[in-house]
C-alpha cells in the first residue's frame, strides 16, 4: 500500500541535492520568482568539490562563461575563491583557449551557502529524499510505454526518509554520486556518496518503479598529502599566469586574491613496478567492480596499463586552500589498498617523506541514462520531473552547473505555464552537451570537449556573453544592471572594430619597420590596422606596444575585436554552415538511400540510419547515435551526389 501523509510544506519547485547542479537550479528557479526549496543531506557540504578543487579547463571554461552569461553563479564563485589561474592552450587558436582556476574548496562552499541563504524565494532543508510523489500511472506507463505516448504521470512532490511529504509542481533531481553510492579502497567498500558522507537510499528504487532505466558508473579521487611533508624546493614550480582574467563577465565579481603556486612531479620506474605487482588488488583489475569510469580522467593504474610504452607520467601537486596544508595529487587516483598507497606516493620525487592525510578511493553510483530526457532536461515519462548533473551520466562541476541552470530554468517555466527552453547545439557548449546526452547511448561518464563541437570557433569563451546574454535577459535571468554592462561592452567592441578597419598605418610611420619585421611582410604605402591584425603573428598586444591600441581598453573588448577581425573569414564560413544546417532540417531523404556505403558517416550512424530510415533531416537528427557531425557529413555527401548527377546530365546533353 502506498505511503500517505498530509504534506509538511508546499513549494513551486523542489531541488534534490546541494551540489553544483542543485545550487544553480535552485538559484535560477528562485530568481525567476518561484517558491523554491533545496534539499540536501548535509548543509555544511554545499557545492563541495570532492575531487579536484578547480574550475575550468578546455571546453569546461567555455561552459562556465556560458553559465555566467545566463546569470549563473559558478564563474563568480570561481573568480572569488581562486588560488591560481592559468590560461591553457594559449599557443593555439582562440577556439581552444581555456581559463582554469585552482579554487579554495572550503571558501567556495561557504560562499555558495551564503549566496543560497541570501537568495529570495529560496528555502534550504537538510533531509534525505527517498521517494517521489506522482499522480497518474504509478508505473510511469510500464515497460511498454513509448515516448510518443507522452507523459504517463505527473510529479506532485517528494517524500523524505523520516516520512515527511513536500508538495511541488516541479522536482529537479541533482543527486550526484549519492544514489546507491559505494566507495572502494582496494577490495574494501562501504555505502557512501563520498568519503565521510552517507549514500542516499530509496530514490533509485522510486525511479525504477516509475519505469526509468538506471545503471552504474564510477569515478575516483586521489589521496591528499600534507604540504609540509613535501620537498617542494626540489620540484618544478607552476605559478599563476592569468590573475587578471576572469570567468565572469560582471566586473563587480572580479576579485584577485593572493596567488599560490602548484608544483610538478613525475612517476618513476618504482611507481610503475609497485602498481604492476599489485594490479589484482584494485577494484577494476581485481574484478570487484565493473562500473565504467571516466575515459579522460583515468586512474594511475589505467595509465600504466593503457600506455605501457610510457616510462613516466606527469603529476601535479595542487593546494586545496589557503588555510589548509592539504595537497591534491592530480593525476594519481588509484584503487590500490590503503596499506599500499603511502608506499606508492613515496615513489614520487619530492614525496619520499610525505604524510598521507586522506587515502584515494573510487566511488560507483546509480545514474539515469539521459536518453530518457527531453532537451529541456525534463523526463519523458513523468511531467514536472527534471534531472541534472552526474545523475545524467556527466562528470565535472562545470557540466553539472550548466545542466542545473537549464533544469532550474525549465522547471520554473513549467510551473509558470511557459514554453520550455531548448539550447541548440550550434549555439553553445551547453546545447552541445545536452544534445549529446539526450541523443546518444552513453556508457561512460561524459565530459565536455572542444572536439565534441563542430562549431568551436564560434563557441568561444570570450563571446559567450554575445551569444547568450540577450537570451538570458529575455528569460529574466539577467538583471538591468548586467544588461547595461553588456550593452556598453558591445558598443565599445563595435567601435573598436570600426576604428581598426578605418585607421591606417603608413610605411613611413615609426612603428612600421618593427611590425614588418614581425610579420615578414612589407607594408606598401599603408595598411589598415585590421588588415595588419589579419597577418600571422600580429596580436593586439603588438599594436599596444607601438601606441596603436589604447592600453586602457578592456581586455574583453580588445581581444574580442582582434578575434572577430583575425578570424572573420573562418567565422563567416562556420556561420554559413550553421545556417545551412538549419535550412536543411526539413530536407527529405531518399527512401532507398544506402547509408552503409557512405564512408564519411560514423559506423554507429550508418547502422542507426539504416535501421530507422528517416524521412528527413529533422527525423534523422532525433535518432540516438546520429551526431550533428554525421548530419553535416550526410548533407555534404548528398550535395556531392546532386552535383555529380547534374554534371552527368549536362554531359549527356
Swiss-Prot record:
Keywords of this entry: Cytoplasm, FAD, Flavoprotein, NAD, tRNA processing
GO biological process: tRNA methylation; tRNA wobble uridine modification
SUPFAM superfamilies xref list: FAD/NAD(P)-binding domain (SSF51905)
Entries under SMART domains matching the protein: GIDA_assoc_3
Membrane-spanning residues: none
Sites where the protein binds NAD(+): 293-307
Binding residues for FAD: 17-22
Highest taxon of source: Bacteria
Cofactor(s) of this protein: FAD
GO molecular function, one term: flavin adenine dinucleotide binding
GO CC terms in record: cytoplasm
Subcellular localization, as worded in the UniProt entry: Cytoplasm
Gene3D superfamilies linked to this entry: FAD/NAD(P)-binding domain, GidA associated domain, C-terminal subdomain, tRNA uridine 5-carboxymethylaminomethyl modification enzyme MnmG/GidA
Subunit structure of this chain's protein: Homodimer. Heterotetramer of two MnmE and two MnmG subunits.
Function: NAD-binding protein involved in the addition of a carboxymethylaminomethyl (cmnm) group at the wobble position (U34) of certain tRNAs, forming tRNA-cmnm(5)s(2)U34.
Similarity comment text for this entry: Belongs to the MnmG family.
Name of protein: tRNA uridine 5-carboxymethylaminomethyl modification enzyme MnmG
